């Protein structure tokens, strides 16, 4: 049987019927947990195998309100976790793997056990796509990132590169011109896939230098484990070069973490869960928060706000049962 853990290390069996189950423990899930717990709903948070969401791999967060000096991502997550637990939220490392919406009850599979819940908040997030190269996990937060808005300001007056060729890559590159001394845009094709207006802006930006028909084949860290350069290969000529950069911004998309809900809930063409009104899904009792439904902003503060909305809407729903 799966277990509920507390920060104190105690273990309890999972209840078979819950008022609220929250899937995910990033900013959205933990904010939902805080609000649901303060409403005396005793939410059960399924953290899964990688608790904390994307912030757990972020070093310094400077744009979350209330921290004028910034705060480490893992510390922010720990603070939110402790706050939720203080009000009565419970946590499990169990991972949601399936959803059954037949009948008048919601049934969620957590590892090897089926749980029933009156309300379900899905805040399972989205995972940035990376290149799958050696040392990738170690370098995330140390000169490798997928968010220029989050990390661009850390790289003032140094060269950086963006990997990708769509609108997201174009937006990242343009944003980084505010800080970096040079922005290399590495794309495996000979022209951008971005919309014409975005492509024109990139190609006319003085600080941006496109590198066409090229892929990154290796990250090169310095002796402190920080990014110092990338190895690139031209896909046409096979020529290999080393490009010194302080940070690599990978902008090749995100994958919403919706495997457990595939074919069960409405999604857009990219797989993001659809929200009908505020945080509500099409199915009664199921609410959605955070990056699993956000294909645009993907910020900690917007995730937290949607987590708040999901918990409040879940409380309203439960009060009407």
Per-region residue spans from a language model:
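Extreme N-terminal leader/targeting segments of oxidoreductases
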Residues: 1-20, 78
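Beta1-alpha1 glycine-rich phosphate/pyrophosphate-binding loop at the start
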Residues: 18-87, 158, 168-196, 268
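A Rossmann-like FAD-binding core segment of flavoenzymes
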Residues: 84-103, 107-110, 114-115, 178-276, ...
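Phosphate-coordination loops involved in phosphoryl transfer and adenosine-cofactor binding
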Residues: 17-19, 93-94, 156-158, 213, ...
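Glycine-rich dinucleotide-binding loop and its adjacent helix/turn
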Residues: 4, 126-179, 274-276
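Conserved phosphate-binding and hydrolysis motifs of nucleotide-dependent enzymes
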Residues: 24-29, 125, 164-166, 290
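FAD-site-proximal beta/loop scaffold in flavoenzymes
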Residues: 132, 138-154, 251-302, 306, ...
């Amino acid at each position: 049987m799966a277990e509920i853990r507390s920060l104190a290390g105690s273990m309890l069996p999972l209840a078979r019927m819950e008022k609220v189950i929250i899937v995910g423990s990033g900013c959205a899930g933990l904010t939902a947990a805080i609000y649901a717990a303060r409403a005396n709903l005793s939410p059960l948070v399924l953290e899964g195998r990688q608790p904390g969401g994307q912030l757990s791999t972020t070093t310094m967060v400077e744009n979350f309100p209330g921290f004028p000096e910034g705060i480490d991502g893992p510390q922010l997550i720990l603070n939110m976790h402790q706050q939720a637990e203080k009000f009565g939220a419970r946590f499990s490392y169990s991972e949601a793997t399936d959803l059954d919406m037949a009948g008048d009850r919601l049934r969620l599979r957590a590892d090897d056990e089926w749980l029933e819940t009156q309300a379900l908040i899905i805040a399972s997030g989205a995972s940035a796509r990376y290149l799958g190269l050696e040392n990738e996990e170690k370098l995330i937060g140390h000169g490798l990132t997928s968010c220029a808005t989050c990390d661009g300001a850390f790289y003032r007056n140094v060269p950086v590169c963006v990997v990708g060729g769509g609108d997201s890559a174009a937006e990242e590159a343009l944003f980084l011109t505010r800080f970096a001394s040079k922005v290399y845009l590495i794309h495996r094709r000979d022209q951008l896939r971005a919309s014409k207006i975005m492509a024109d802006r990139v190609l006319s930006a003085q600080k941006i230098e496109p590198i066409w028909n090229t892929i990154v084949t290796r990250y090169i860290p310095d002796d402190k484990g920080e990014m110092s350069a990338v190895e690139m290969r031209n896909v046409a000529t096979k020529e290999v070069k080393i490009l010194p950069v302080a940070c690599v911004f990978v902008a090749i998309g995100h994958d919403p973490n919706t495997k457990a809900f595939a074919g069960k809930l409405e999604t857009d063409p990219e797989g993001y869960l659809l929200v009908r009104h505020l945080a509500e899904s099409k199915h009664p009792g199921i609410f959605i928060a955070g990056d699993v439904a956000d294909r645009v902003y993907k910020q900690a503060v917007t995730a937290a706000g949607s987590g708040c909305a999901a918990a409040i809407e879940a409380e309203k729903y439960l009060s009407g049962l």
